[in-house]
Amino acid sequence: MSVAEIFERVDKNKDGKISWDEFAEAIRAFSPSITSEEIDNMFREIDVDGDNQIDVAEYASCLMLGGEGNKEDEDIVMKEAFDLYDIDGDGKISASEIHVVLKRLGEKQTIAECIAMVRAVDADGDGFVSFEEFKTMMSCNNKKLQ
């Protein structure tokens, strides 16, 4: 099952984000005796931007952090997350693709803000986020969590 498929199963109301209640329901399915406090701690750790919802990028980052997986597993999860943003499948993410995905997730970033996001990680200056640049960006996010 892919990252996107798992995310969609947990996202019961299909709004593109996982609420605390959706998260708690999924966690309790695997660990019925877990306390609400433990769920809160896990949720806060995954919810990097602090908006009280887990988006697909935060979820993918969590999977990479939490597992005992190897580099190959990490690359597979990373590629699936990248593909969610690479709408046209051309192997690179544009500012407009980021804008579309974020809009679907209920975010309100402007196209100008999305262009700034791309520029922040665009190491080769081509105006797009390559898979390698995406991996670097996600690795930086993971280090902030640890």
UniProtKB/Swiss-Prot annotation:
SMART domains: EFh (SM00054). Ca(2+) 2 binds at D47, D49, D51, Q53, E58. It comes from the Eukaryota. Keywords: Calcium, Metal-binding, Repeat. Ca(2+) 1 binds at D11, N13, D15, K17, E22. Ca(2+) 4 binds at D122, D124, D126, E133. The keyword Cell inner membrane does not apply. PROSITE patterns: EF_HAND_1, EF_HAND_2. Residues 1-33, 34-69, 73-108, 109-144 form the EF-hand domain. It holds the Pfam family EF-hand_7. Signal peptide: none annotated. GO terms for molecular function: calcium ion binding. SUPFAM superfamilies: EF-hand. The keyword tRNA processing does not apply. Ca(2+) 3 binds at D86, D88, D90, K92, E97. Potential calcium sensor. This is Probable calcium-binding protein CML32. It comes from Arabidopsis thaliana.
